[in-house]
């Protein structure tokens, strides 16, 4: 277990795609990555050796050529508070983006000094 405000593990990497269905066929059928789940028509997820790969079509105003690093954290609220106190410029506070069968997915997005998007991600299990 790591202390709040300590980042130690990449959980997810986001890659932009223009055609999610075409990209799914490539990553699943050509590269052989295990398909996890999708939220059609914009998102598809794969397992890449324990790191999740998210393929997505860009939302207007959020289109950028780079990838997004998602850091896995246990307590997103405490980590957000610690990093914000260190001057990290958060775009969004911690917020729930999805409820899956067995867990919720929470994000808090921020930028590095070069304008690259990074995010904290927490997936607490439902009780």
Predicted segments, located by residue:
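N-terminal beta-strand motif that seeds the catalytic metal site of vicinal oxygen chelate
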Residues: 1-21, 67-69, 122-127
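Vicinal oxygen chelate
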Residues: 1-6, 86-127
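Core segments of cupin and vicinal oxygen chelate
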Residues: 7-8, 14-53
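Short amphipathic alpha-helices in soluble, non-transmembrane regions
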Residues: 29-30, 81-87
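Conserved short beta-strand elements that form part of the metal-binding/catalytic scaffold
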Residues: 34-67, 117-123
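Short hydrophobic/aromatic beta-strand element in the GNAT-like acyltransferase core
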Residues: 52, 70, 107-109
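Short amphipathic alpha-helices within nucleic acid-binding modules
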Residues: 77-82, 116
């Amino acid at each position: 277990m790591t202390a709040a405000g300590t980042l130690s593990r990449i959980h997810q990497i986001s890659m932009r795609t223009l055609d999610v269905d075409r990209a799914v066929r490539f990553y699943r059928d050509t590269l052989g990555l295990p398909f996890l789940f999708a939220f059609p028509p914009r998102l598809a997820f794969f397992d890449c050796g324990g790191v999740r790969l998210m393929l997505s079509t860009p939302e207007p105003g959020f289109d950028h050529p780079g990838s997004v690093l998602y850091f896995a954290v246990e307590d997103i609220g405490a980590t957000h508070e610690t990093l914000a106190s260190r001057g990290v410029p958060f775009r969004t506070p911690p917020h729930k983006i999805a409820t899956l069968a067995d867990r919720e997915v929470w994000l808090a997005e921020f930028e590095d000094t070069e304008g690259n998007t990074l995010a904290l991600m927490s997936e607490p299990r439902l009780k």
